Amino acid sequence: MELWFTEYQTPTLGITCKTKKTLHSEKTEYQELAVIETEQFGRMLLLDGIIQTTVADEFVYHEMIAHVPLFTHKNPKKALVVGGGDGGSIREIVKHPSIEKAVLCEIDRRVIEVSKEYLPEISCALDNEKVEVVVGDGIKYVKEHKNEFDVIIIDSTDPIGPAEGLFAIDFYRAVYDCLKEDGIFVAQTESPFIDKELITRIIRDVKSLFPITRLYTCAIPTYPTGYWCFTMGSKKYDPLETDIDSIPDIDTKYYCPQIHRAAFILPKFAKELIK
């Protein structure tokens, strides 16, 4: 008998994958957590039935959420990831020689533990000597740390449940205060095809706090519509002015200097969202 998994991404849209088996399933303190083996995308991490990452396409998301702000900043030494318990963003951050410390703040301990067990290629840097893992509320952590980080990455789930507060202007204010005077933050901000109002609001909120606000995009097959965006708020450095010729060669599959520049070139319909 064939087994198929379907994520209903909207009331009228979904993605369906043929599965081999369920490797893990549990109800944590915060959410339903599962890892399944799929034919097309390999192992897939699910939270409340929503695809978070897969071994086949995770590199796109993690490289773009991490390297764009890190190479925009002139000398990032300390970075924070809020969410991202699978460890993919941390893996990319520690590829940068300038990084002296990377902090992961994940509210659900079991996401970290299960990722280490079933997704070692993604979570492989969580035990790196430069990495500190904090199990706790990311909003609380950010509010308790002022003027501390060069780069903050909001690697959150969708804006429902435990992650809802990570999309609020009060949180963005706390992020601003948590950053150093030349700091940069990036948040994943969903699909411009189906989350237009959310993106417009986030851009407006971030613009009210940061002198430089940019939207950039990439293609992620397993995320809703396959077209995803990130919002950057920067106190000093403009990613459009990054000297891409000076970006060193690092081990990536998607990100490159040309992609760094091209990701900010938006189709007309997406430009309308950020006016």
Curated annotation (Swiss-Prot):
GO molecular function terms noted in the UniProt entry: spermidine synthase activity
Catalytic activity: S-adenosyl 3-(methylsulfanyl)propylamine + putrescine = S-methyl-5'-thioadenosine + spermidine + H(+)
InterPro entries hit by this protein: PABS, PABS_CS, SAM-dependent_MTases_sf, Spermi_synthase, Spermidine_synt_N, Spermidine_synt_N_sf
GO CC, any one term: cytosol
Annotated Gene3D superfamilies: Spermidine synthase, tetramerisation domain (2.30.140.10), Vaccinia Virus protein VP39 (3.40.50.150)
Domain PABS: 2-235
Annotated Pfam families: Spermine_synt_N (PF17284), Spermine_synth (PF01564)
Pathways involved: Amine and polyamine biosynthesis; spermidine biosynthesis; spermidine from putrescine: step 1/1
Top-level enzyme category: transferase
GO BP terms: spermidine biosynthetic process
Keyword Cytoplasm: yes
Top-level taxon in the UniProt lineage: Bacteria
Record localization: Cytoplasm
Family designation: Belongs to the spermidine/spermine synthase family.
NCBIfam families cross-referenced by the UniProt entry: MFS_SpdSyn, PRK00811.1, speE
HAMAP family, sorted: Spermidine_synth
Protein name: Polyamine aminopropyltransferase
Native source species: Acetivibrio thermocellus (strain ATCC 27405 / DSM 1237 / JCM 9322 / NBRC 103400 / NCIMB 10682 / NRRL B-4536 / VPI 7372)
Gene giving rise to this polypeptide: speE
